[in-house]
UniProtKB/Swiss-Prot annotation:
EC number: 7.4.2.8
One of the Pfam families matching this protein, by short name: P-loop_SecA
Keywords: ATP-binding, Cell inner membrane, Cell membrane, Cytoplasm, Membrane, Nucleotide-binding, Protein transport, Thylakoid, Translocase, Translocation, Transport
UniProt keyword Protein transport present: yes
Protein name according to UniProt: Protein translocase subunit SecA
UniProt topology in membrane: Peripheral membrane protein
Residues where ATP binds: 90, 108-112, 509
Function: Part of the Sec protein translocase complex. Interacts with the SecYEG preprotein conducting channel. Has a central role in coupling the hydrolysis of ATP to the transfer of proteins into and across the cell membrane, serving as an ATP-driven molecular motor driving the stepwise translocation of polypeptide chains across the membrane. Probably participates in protein translocation into and across both the cytoplasmic and thylakoid membranes in cyanobacterial cells.
Gene name per UniProt: secA
Length: 934
């Protein structure tokens, strides 16, 4: 009703951008005739104008003013360098991002290209722009691919990758535009705030940030904080014993009601992801361990047993983690990717290692941490893009103060979303998925099946193998991850079948008929690998499509394949081209050396050759011509295949379970029907799926009994669909509340973190260190007076002996101070007198130390302040964690846990800062440098 009265707010926003789009089109005609150098000259002119404006506040209005011309310049550069012209809707997307909003753009609408517009505009200030992606591969791809536009226009482009050294990172952060992943940015921020010297700091001040797949980073990952930790020794045998106890205990069939324990040793609440021992379970565990009390502070066991039970019940192998090279490696539940190097905290990872009988690694202690929510709020202007933001609009608005604008698609969507099919049992569902896949495959259409775990993808793989259907498997198993882009490059070919966990949803578009450009690059990689790459480099050859054994990994020939050629390539190359490639390989060996490159170096050179940017290097030129030649031959076949696939109905996407979030379902659907292509989607569900089991409740159980249908009969019911959507909304609200709680609690830490980090940065910059330490001393003297002097008592009753004794403890240089000297002074006079004494003593100390070596006093000041900040902050983080754990129980006493946490946390913080000041003063006066030996 409101929409009818007031009009659609989104449409109103879009209308506002229309005149600017017209301005850009007019400017385009003026800019098109410019030479490359003249086009680059525009960048220099913009930069000069902004440099004269000075502060960021003065630059903002100028940025808005030059936006139409800057966007027209980028549009022209895109045409010249990439052969891609920004559509009008992409210009609108760029404006939405420049204003610091979230642009919702459907899959295949060219979000990556949109980001070039606001990145270029905001980089002109010289303050740096960060473009954030979800993984290293996408960051590298975007920096290489879109970076060409920026480099062509005279801006520098940086890239941050996981294994870079600090000096490389600093160089890349100092570029005008830096591509990085969210985790690298966050960890660099934390490491910078642990640096012992300003030369170790790699980032500069934040200015503007564009996040690709913003929902994945700001929402899906918002529950897990970034943590840098140090190792703590804990007895390993405790984890092993706890795992044995957990295995011997029996799970209760139901949860406790009205405080009465169910039958069994422990209960599992899957919704809250928690395990709790019953009274019977406590008794059994204590008996097995031979202890009187699991909670004994001298020999605590409760924590180990709880973690072991969680490892047994809630952390499932090949779903939550995989075992690789003797280690338990986490699998990201949203993307399905493995996260090597990341570990669950609080002893949980060790419990999983004990369960799997792996070597148990040391437990860790938090040295620094921050949530993504608070990290990204450090940027003065933040923007993001995604295909699916509207479902989380409220959260973006409330947590990040980010508006969402839906950008219209360039072409009308032609995708058909077919009704869900729900089966009574899981086995029936998987049979139906395999049958539909086989049916669509026979019609010559490509199929993408999305699964929720490694285990499920392998189950479907074996079902398809039974029907002898060739397919590719894409999941977090290491042998498949390497081939992700190769598999996706051919997922749109006629009759191709691809099974993927959630990981395949991001970054690489599925092109109908296959991606001839990428296949040409792979062909060159295959030809050159053996000749140019070091033999010990572990490289995997491209993966062909003909795979039909269980797991999709044998080379058995498929019976009915609409394919030419035996490999992943659309057709064999002509003899002439084959010979030309052989000659190219020989020429490159002469130029670059026999097997002298790494795989990554070779791939980077092929990627550079595949770009359109001008190059002087003759070898890159030759590579470029070879790629074009191979692509030309493939194109003929791919174009025919594309029209066959279009006529057959395009890509069909099958979902095999509703995800907890509607957004992830929409991302999977969005793989089909990109840019107006034909396509279709369908979800297959069973009443045993996690979502329905955990959140669907009794209503669905009732339905199961009501439907007296055959196993293989699908159920389609409006009531069931509503139940499903209700369950998803319930889950989304539940997780939103958790994220909100994480945010509210971390907000308390955030204010403290900012105070500590800004104090630390002041010290690193070496600004007025002496003044800072004297300030600490003056406050300490004031605190000593307040501790030993009661203004309500007459001065003759003040305990001046103890007061003077305490002052001498801190400042041994005042050993001649006596109570008589301070007799008769009022409270404020006493403070002023002692502060004056402190300043004199400090000058004396400085004189002594500077005699040893000039500048030593400043070094000592910096060392002691940093040492105290780091040690006490680390202890404070642990204390705050413990407070957070215990404060929850106060809800039972009718107190708000968050308010209790804020108040006590604030008191603890003040105490920490007081201790830091006192320890620094004490250390500075006690500092006795050794005289250098001659």
């Amino acid at each position: 009703m409101l929409k009818l009265l007031l009009g659609d707010p989104n449409a109103r926003k879009l209308k506002r951008y229309q005149p600017i789009v017209s301005d850009i089109q007019l400017l385009e005609e003026e800019i098109a005739p410019l030479s490359d150098d003249e086009l680059r000259g525009r960048t220099a002119a913009f930069q000069e104008r902004l440099a004269n404006a000075g502060s960021l506040a003065n630059q903002r209005p100028i940025l808005d003013e030059i936006l139409p011309e800057a966007f027209a310049v980028v549009r022209e550069a895109g045409k010249r360098v990439l052969g891609m012209r920004h559509f009008d809707v992409q210009l609108i997307g760029g404006m939405v991002l420049h204003e610091g909003q979230i642009a919702e753009m459907k899959t295949g609408e060219g979000k990556t290209l949109v980001a070039t517009l606001p990145s270029y505009l905001n980089a002109l200030t010289g303050r740096g722009v960060h473009v954030v992606t979800v993984n290293d591969y996408l960051a590298r791809r975007d920096a290489e691919w879109m970076g060409q536009v920026h480099r062509f226009l005279g801006l520098s482009v940086g890239l941050i990758q996981q294994d870079m050294r600090p000096e490389e990172r600093r160089r890349n952060y100092n570029c005008d535009i830096t591509y990085a992943t969210n985790s690298e940015l966050g960890f660099d921020y934390l490491r910078d705030n642990m640096a012992a010297d300003i030369s170790e700091v790699v980032q500069r001040e934040f200015q503007y940030c564009v996040i690709d797949e913003v929902d994945s980073i700001l929402i899906d990952e918002a529950r897990t904080p970034l943590i840098i930790s140090g190792q703590v020794e804990r007895p390993q045998e405790k984890y092993q014993q706890a795992a044995e106890v957990a295995n011997a205990l029996a799970r209760a069939a139901e949860l406790s009601k009205d405080g009465i324990d169910p039958e069994g040793d422990y209960e599992v609440d899957e919704k809250q992801r928690s395990c709790t021992l019953t009274d019977e379970g406590f008794a059994k565990a204590e008996q097995m361990l031979g202890v009187a009390d699991l909670f004994n502070p001298q020999d605590p066991w409760a924590h180990y047993i709880t973690n072991a039970l969680k490892a047994k019940e809630l952390f499932v192998k090949d779903v939550n983690y995989i075992v690789r090279d003797g280690e338990a490696v986490i699998v990201d539940e949203f993307t399905g990717r493995v996260m090597p190097g990341r570990r669950w905290s609080d002893g949980q990872h060790q419990a999983i290692e004990a369960k799997e009988a792996l070597a148990i690694q040391s437990e860790t202690q938090t040295l620094a941490s921050i949530t993504y929510q608070n990290f990204f709020l450090l940027y003065p202007r933040l923007a993001g893009m995604t295909g699916t933001a509207k479902t989380e609009e409220v959260e973006f608005e409330k947590t990040y103060k980010l508006e969402t604008t839906i950008v219209p698609t360039n072409r009308v969507r032609a995708r058909q979303d077919w009704a869900d099919q729900v089966y009574k049992t899981e086995a029936a569902k998987w049979r139906a998925v395999a049958n539909e896949t086989a049916e669509i495959h026979k019609n010559g259409r490509p199929v993408l099946v999305g699964t929720t775990s490694v285990e499920k993808s392998e189950l479907l793989s074996s079902l398809l193998a039974e029907q002898e259907i060739p397919h590719n498997l894409l999941n977090a198993k290491p042998e498949n991850v390497e081939r992700e882009s190769e598999i996706v490059a051919q997922a749109g070919r006629a009759g191709a079948v691809t099974i993927a966990t959630n990981m395949a949803g991001r970054g690489t578009d599925i092109i109908l008929g296959g991606n001839s450009d990428y296949m040409a690059r792979l062909k060159l990689r295959e030809v050159l690998l053996g000749r140019l790459v070091k033999p010990e480099e572990d490289h995997t050859p491209p993966v062909p499509l003909q795979r039909s054994a269980p797991g999709g990994f044998s080379d058995a020939a498929a019976p009915s394949l609409p394919r030419s050629g035996e490999s992943l390539y659309p057709c064999p190359l002509t003899d002439d081209t084959d010979q030309a490639l052989g000659q190219l390989a020989r020429d490159l060996v002469k130029a670059w050396g026999d097997r002298a490159l790494t795989v990554i170096e070779l791939e980077e050179r092929i990627a550079t050759a595949a770009e359109k940017a001008p190059t002087e290097a003759p070898q890159i030129q030759a590579l470029r011509e070879a790629i074009a030649r191979v692509k030309g031959e493939y194109d003929a076949v791919v174009k025919q295949e594309e029209s066959r696939v279009r006529e057959a109905g395009g890509l069909h996407v099958i979902g095999t379970e509703r995800h907890e979030s509607r957004r992830v379902d929409n991302q999977l659907r969005g793989r089909a029907g990109r840019q107006g292509d034909p396509g279709s989607t369908r979800f297959f569900l069973s009443l045993g799926d996690n979502l329905l089991r955990i959140f669907g409740g009794d209503r669905v159980a009732g339905l199961m009994n009501a439907f007296r249908v055959e196993e293989d009969m699908p159920i389609e019911s409006g009531m069931l669909t509503r139940s499903l959507e209700g369950a998803q909304k319930k889950v989304e609200t539940y997780y939103y509340d958790i994220r909100k709680q994480v945010f509210e609690y971390d907000e308390v830490m955030n204010n403290q973190r900012r105070a500590v980090y800004s104090e630390r940065r002041r010290v690193l910059d070496g600004r007025a260190l002496k003044k800072q330490v004297i300030g600490y001393g003056e406050r300490t003297m004031g605190e000593i007076v307040e501790a030993y002097v009661n203004p309500d008592l007459p001065p003759e009753e003040w305990d001046l002996d103890q007061l003077v004794g305490k002052v001498k403890e801190f400042i041994y240089l005042l050993e001649d101070l006596t109570p008589d000297q301070v007799q008769g002074l009022g409270m404020e006079e006493l403070k002023a007198f002692l502060q004056e004494q402190l300043r004199n003593a400090y000058d004396l100390k400085e004189g002594q130390i500077e005699q040893q070596r000039p500048g030593l006093m400043r070094e000592a000041e910096r060392f002691f302040i940093l040492q105290q900040i780091d040690t006490l902050w680390r202890e404070h983080l642990q204390a705050m964690d413990a407070l957070r754990e215990s404060v929850g129980l106060r809800g039972y006493g009718q107190k708000d846990p968050l308010i209790e946490y804020k108040n006590e946390g604030y008191d603890m913080f003040l105490e920490m800062m007081t201790n830091m000041r006192r320890n620094v003063i004490y250390s500075m006066f006690m500092f006795q440098p050794q005289a250098p030996k001659n």
